């Protein structure tokens, strides 16, 4: 334990002792609670036993009567902030029993009441409580405890307190909490929907940001709310046309069609805007002599050029947000993308009236929900089109500049650590094992489309050099659910069995994908636009106990298919590992709110059956790929079969998962093609050797009898091969009659060899080439020469005696390698010719059983890999 951890434990212990008799002075008490909150914020989740023991008296003291029911509001908020940190530390376990947790939730919900007061002393603590509740998902525990009244009160506080001056993090936290409560509720009462419906009325008294929050929540839960929303509207007694258009579209079942129409309209407007921007760029290039120097000074004008893209101050809210990103100064809350009106906080006061005027015009033309969706979609399009000129602005692939942007999104007390989730008692282990999207929620929504833009660029650059790769990518996108899982499993076995004597790399769940990524990394050399993607995090969580070996030889093979110059295996392995890490690190970030509303909503039906997805395992800290095999409509659960053969029945709404994107599917398809080529290549020598037929088997057995060194020694050096080949040529020039006679003699010797020794022994000795055998080949150079001399007379006696009667002593002598030829037995020229031919054949034939042994070792290796214990979820 480090000194800082020990010091932190001492601070926690002292605070717990002080809570027994807290300071009587209000100022001293608030100062003490402030220090305690800072100390608790430094404690990591799931701490060691010593820290848990130090926290025990502190946890009891915080729920004591003196502090818990204090009359001062700031003291209550400070206590609630400390308790919310404790719920984060102890997650996924609740820190208190059910009755105490109900009281804790009352205190937490009461702290949300004055979120509107930004000048309050406790404002930062209120924001911290809000973010912690969203991350730990403790609102699900409120559902389990049937705290419906508290949930309704919390909804009311959110919709009343939200303001334009709040950061995007506040807006997204409120949205996530409300969406989660509605999605996880088995039955949604009309009282819970009442504050949301009140906020979407066509009433001037309701603030625009409150209406936008309510509409966003309704949009996220549209599929589930159809029945409940209709009943709530009827019970309210307010006509349907008095509400926002999104309410009518959900009740009438036209919400999905409305979204599709909106997307089409956005694409048309975007294409027209793109043409206008190109003409603006040309005009600006002709008018302004120094483009780069004049553009920043021309901010108050109608157009300016930044990175080659014309931007207009009064064109739209989205254009202003683009200008904000191009600005090199400090940026304010990137997640204000969810709140389009707040994206202009850094602009000058002269620009704000124009922006508000544009928003009002849009609201007159269409509904509020259309305006919100339009601003998001067009913002995404604005950034996707000039992606080639704005690569440095990419959120997912940019260098450490983006880390400061991500840090800006957090509040004063935001911590860069993973947060587990409090489990739902009804959902059991399923919810307990789901990790909250900690960093994914902090990233702006541009991250997903920008990633897509980079993928498109990569595909286009790859198409110029290798059209076949692009065709494979298209096939994967068209048929992602057919043969992909089986091919992936085959490729995993192939990699595992490709080498027997090489040292293996430490195994991971993604072992098969590393070889796939090695192939992709070569393509990224061609697509130079994506060179910056190599700067990725250098740590990868590995799944324990899942042993699938990867050797350097297999990495060479996978990269060699691209006809690139041979690279050292160390560099190639490191490059492929970086790419695999990129896949692991990027996927949590892509699970944003927008993707949740469109993608994760599918988990309630059968539309996911047959899809390739990846599921987050919090204990292993890794994503595992699999296929959605089936869906149980009664239980609303999916059967997921992982690539390693494991099966799970999951309630996907409680899991952290995401469908495989095009890049990952294309990697799988490329690996499948590569595996097919390897299998075809491995079968070609087998068929060639099979043509030798009976003779190769016969030569194998006779060589075993004569040499006494086993067929594993029959693999000679190239020099010996050439000498024997020349000897073959000489003997082949002899008469054809002698060859026919020798064939008959060998047929009889084959029968004797089969009687003496079962075929199993030959197969095993021929195929098992251990390190000991390999070393014996090099050591027995001299014994080979003598064994060859012994081989000729021994074979001659075998063939000559085979006609007269059974041979007993000769095979026994030849097996030990000590048998000597009888002086009286003279070998005929025909037998000599056949001996030399059999020697040359034995040079080649022992390679034949190798694939069988490979298959055996592959099976044993596969069984070993599956025997590794997977951490229980």
Curated annotation (Swiss-Prot):
| Cellular compartment(s) | Nucleus
**Basic and acidic residues bias (residue ranges):** 266-301, 320-334, 349-365, 373-394, 456-466, 511-526, 535-555, 726-746, 844-853
Residue stretches of biased makeup (Acidic residues): 661-681, 747-757
Q: Name one GO cellular component term.
A: nucleus
Q: Which residues carry this modification: Phosphothreonine?
A: 289
UniProt keywords (A-Z) are: Cell cycle, Cell division, DNA damage, DNA repair, Mitosis, Nucleus, Phosphoprotein, Repeat
What phenotype is described for loss of this gene? Weak impact on meiosis such as formation of some chromosome bridges at late anaphase I and telophase I in forming pollen, but severe effects on development, fertility, somatic homologous recombination (HR) and DNA repair, especially in plants lacking PDS5A, PDS5B, PDS5C, PDS5D and PDS5E.
Q: Which SUPFAM superfamilies match?
A: ARM repeat, Tudor/PWWP/MBT
Keyword Acyltransferase among record annotations? no
* HEAT repeats (start-end): 53-92, 99-136, 149-187, 189-227
Location of the region described as Disordered in the Swiss-Prot/TrEMBL record: 266-611, 658-873
Per the UniProt entry, what is one GO biological process?
A: mitotic sister chromatid cohesion
Q: Where is the composition biased (Low complexity)?
A: 494-510, 701-725, 795-814, 822-831, 854-866
Q: Which Pfam families match?
A: PDS5
What the record says about family reads: Belongs to the PDS5 family.
Question: What name is this protein filed under?
Answer: Sister chromatid cohesion protein PDS5 homolog C
**To which species is this protein native?**
Arabidopsis thaliana
Tell me the lineage of the source organism: Eukaryota, Viridiplantae, Streptophyta, Embryophyta, Tracheophyta
This protein's encoding gene: PDS5C
């Amino acid at each position: 334990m480090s000194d800082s951890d020990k010091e932190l434990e001492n601070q926690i212990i002292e605070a717990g002792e002080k809570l027994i008799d807290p300071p009587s002075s209000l100022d001293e008490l608030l100062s003490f609670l402030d220090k305690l909150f800072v100390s608790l914020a430094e404690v990591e989740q799931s701490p060691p036993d010593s820290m848990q023991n130090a926290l025990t008296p502190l946890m009891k003291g915080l729920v004591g009567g003196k502090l818990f029911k204090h009359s001062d509001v700031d003291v209550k908020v400070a206590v609630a902030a400390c308790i919310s940190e404790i719920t984060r530390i102890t997650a996924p376990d609740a820190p208190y029993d059910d009755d105490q947790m109900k009281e804790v939730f009352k205190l937490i919900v009461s702290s949300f009441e004055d979120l509107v007061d930004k000048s309050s002393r406790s404002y930062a603590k209120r924001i911290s409580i809000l973010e912690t509740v969203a991350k730990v998902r403790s609102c699900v525990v409120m559902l389990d405890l049937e705290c419906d009244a508290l949930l309704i009160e919390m909804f009311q506080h959110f919709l009343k307190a939200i303001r334009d001056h709040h950061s995007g993090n506040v807006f997204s936290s409120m949205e996530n909490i409300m969406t989660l409560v509605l999605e996880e509720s088995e039955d949604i009462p009309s009282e819970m929907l009442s504050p949301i419906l009140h906020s979407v009325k066509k009433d001037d008294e309701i603030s625009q940001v409150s209406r936008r929050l309510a509409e966003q929540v309704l949009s996220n839960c549209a599929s589930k709310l159809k029945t409940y929303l209709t009943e709530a509207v009827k019970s309210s007694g307010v006509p349907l046309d008095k509400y926002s258009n999104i309410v009518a579209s959900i009740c009438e079942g036209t919400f999905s069609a409305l979204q599709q129409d909106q997307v089409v309209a956005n694409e048309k407007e975007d294409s027209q805007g793109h043409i206008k921007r190109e003409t603006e760029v040309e005009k600006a290039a002709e008018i302004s002599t120094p483009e780069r120097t004049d553009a920043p000074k021309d901010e108050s004008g109608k157009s300016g050029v930044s990175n080659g893209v014309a931007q207009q101050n009064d064109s739209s809210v989205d254009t202003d947000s683009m200008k904000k990103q191009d600005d090199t100064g400090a940026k304010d809350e990137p997640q204000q993308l969810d709140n389009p009106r707040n994206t202009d906080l850094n602009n000058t006061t002269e620009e704000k009236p124009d922006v508000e005027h544009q928003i009002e015009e849009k609201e007159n033309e269409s509904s509020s929900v259309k305006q919100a969706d339009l601003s998001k979609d067009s913002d995404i399009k604005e950034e996707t089109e000039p992606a080639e000129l704005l690569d440095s602005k990419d959120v997912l692939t940019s260098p450490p500049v983006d880390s400061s942007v991500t840090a800006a999104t957090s509040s004063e007390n935001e911590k860069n650590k993973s947060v587990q989730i409090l489990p739902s008692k009804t959902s059991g282990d399923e919810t307990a094992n789901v990790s909250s999207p900690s960093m994914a929620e902090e990233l702006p929504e541009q991250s997903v489309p920008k990633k897509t833009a980079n993928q498109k660029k990569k595909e286009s650059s790859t198409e110029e050099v290798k059209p076949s790769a692009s065709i494979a990518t298209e096939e994967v996108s068209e048929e992602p659910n057919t043969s992909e899982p089986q091919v992936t499993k085959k490729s995993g076995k192939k990699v595992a069995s490709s080498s027997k004597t090489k040292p293996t790399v430490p195994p991971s769940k993604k072992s098969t994908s590393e070889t796939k990524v090695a192939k992709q990394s070569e393509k990224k050399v061609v697509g130079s636009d994506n060179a910056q993607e190599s700067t990725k995090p250098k740590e990868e969580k590995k799944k324990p106990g899942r042993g699938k070996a990867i050797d350097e030889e297999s990495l060479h093979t996978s990269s060699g298919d691209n006809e690139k110059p041979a690279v050292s295996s160390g560099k190639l392995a490191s490059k492929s590992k970086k790419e695999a890490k990129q896949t692991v690190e990027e996927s949590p970030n892509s699970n944003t709110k927008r993707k949740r509303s469109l993608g994760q909503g599918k988990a309630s039906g059968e539309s996911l059956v047959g899809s390739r997805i990846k599921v987050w395992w919090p204990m292993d800290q890794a994503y595992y790929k699999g296929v959605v095999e089936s869906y149980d409509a009664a239980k609303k659960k999916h059967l997921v079969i992982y690539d390693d053969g494991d099966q799970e029945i999951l309630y996907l709404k409680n899991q952290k998962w995401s469908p495989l994107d095009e890049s990952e599917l294309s990697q799988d398809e490329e690996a499948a093609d590569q595996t097919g080529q390897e299998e075809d290549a491995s079968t070609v020598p087998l068929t060639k050797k099979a043509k030798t037929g009976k003779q190769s088997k016969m030569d194998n057995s006779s060589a075993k009898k004569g040499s006494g060194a086993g067929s594993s020694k029959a693999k000679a050096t190239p020099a010996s091969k050439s000498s024997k080949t020349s000897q073959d040529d000489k003997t082949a020039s002899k008469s054809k009659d002698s060859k026919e006679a020798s064939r008959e003699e060998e047929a009889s010797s084959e029968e004797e060899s089969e009687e003496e020794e079962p075929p199993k022994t030959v197969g095993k000795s021929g195929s098992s080439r251990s390190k000991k055998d390999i070393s014996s080949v090099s050591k027995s150079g001299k014994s080979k020469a003598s064994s060859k001399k012994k081989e000729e007379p021994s074979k001659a006696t075998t063939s000559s005696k085979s006609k007269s009667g059974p041979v007993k002593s000769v095979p026994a002598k030849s097996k030990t390698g000590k048998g000597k030829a009888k002086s009286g037995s003279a070998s005929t020229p025909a037998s000599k010719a056949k001996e030399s031919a059999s020697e040359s054949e034995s040079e080649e034939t022992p390679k034949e059983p190798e694939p069988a042994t490979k298959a055996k070792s592959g099976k044993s290796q596969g069984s070993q890999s599956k025997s590794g214990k997977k951490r229980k979820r």
